[in-house]
Amino acid sequence: MKGKTCCVTGHRDLPQNEINKIKTALAHEIDAAATDGFTCFMSGFADGVDQYFVELVLERKQTTPALELIAVIPYRKRLDSLNKKTRTRELLEACADVVVIQEKYLPSVYSHRNRYMVEHSDRVIAVYDGRETGGTAKTIRFTHRMKKELREIPVGEIVLPDHLKPKTK
């Protein structure tokens, strides 16, 4: 990977009425990253945010050929299943590189993938609804621990932790 690197994390289950807003915000963050000198973009190729990010980066690559997209796939069978879908296979073929984190599935494989992306990135774009659990929340916490730049795109109604919720009678 050459140049500065940016990756994405976000939810798979997004409110349908927010998808256009999310895509617009992602496009803005990708454009801002490119303006800031980022040339390498990484995606875990999951459904939802990851796929939108891939499409948007590849659109921009048509006018800015120096941009590179790296697919970071958690395990080999996941890559095999992605390659069975024509559109996803085309997206993978457009990548500068495909990194497979490990050969076999283990419950921790998605955390390992997310960790790899953060460790190899200078900036992380997070599409996040405030949930304290799940892969996106863990990736955001890891981003903070690694002292990497984080750009958050809020989604829907932010879910407050219990201790911050207003008390009801």
Where are these regions (language model features)?
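Acidic/glycine-enriched connector segments
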Residues: M1-K167
